[in-house]
Curated annotation (Swiss-Prot):
CDD domains: Ribosomal_L30. Gene3D superfamilies: Ribosomal protein L30, ferredoxin-like fold domain. It comes from Ruegeria sp. (strain TM1040) (Silicibacter sp.). The keyword Magnesium does not apply. This is Large ribosomal subunit protein uL30. GO terms for cellular component: cytosolic large ribosomal subunit. Part of the 50S ribosomal subunit. Keywords: Ribonucleoprotein, Ribosomal protein. It comes from the Bacteria.
Amino acid sequence: MAKTIVVKQIGSPIRRPAEQRATLIGLGLNKMHKTRELEDTPSVRGMVNKIPHLVEIVEERD
């Protein structure tokens, strides 16, 4: 079974650059305080690291 991470949106995309909004949509997030369980891959980690002020990693699962 693949490792996964649970990502939660903690910031609003209002008045943020379009690139940051697109990154949120790429992670499957669009509303405040929503969570998503995503595969722990380098591409997902990179997207999370691009917008640390908008998302947080809640949990890492095996």
